[in-house]
Amino acid sequence: MKKTINIIVLILLISFNSNAQNNYQIKRATSFSEYATTQLKLTKEDQKFLYDTYLAKFVAQREKIHGKELSDEEKKQIYKASRNELVKTLNTRFNTEKTKAIMAAVKEVRDKEK
């Protein structure tokens, strides 16, 4: 009985921690997509695309980094590869100039958050 209660408590704690991480990623993806949309006057469909793209980026980064004892250099490589993949994905929907403008807008909002 005691083991069952401990297991249930452990599952709940893991669930809450996972939700907290997902909420952070959702908040960032929302912030980035909303800011870029207002700055560049993008459509709601474009905003949804940006949101989905950034959320996928953040989730993938977390999976590659979280819980692993990586050096700063290894993390930088993951972030760089993630950025390159993001640019490729954005280029499937937007032209190069629009992609650069989106990246600049996101950098601007990211710098404001610091």
Q: Predicted segment positions?
A:
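Bacterial Sec-dependent N-terminal signal peptides
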Residues: M1-Q25
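Charge-rich (acidic/polar
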Residues: Q21-K114
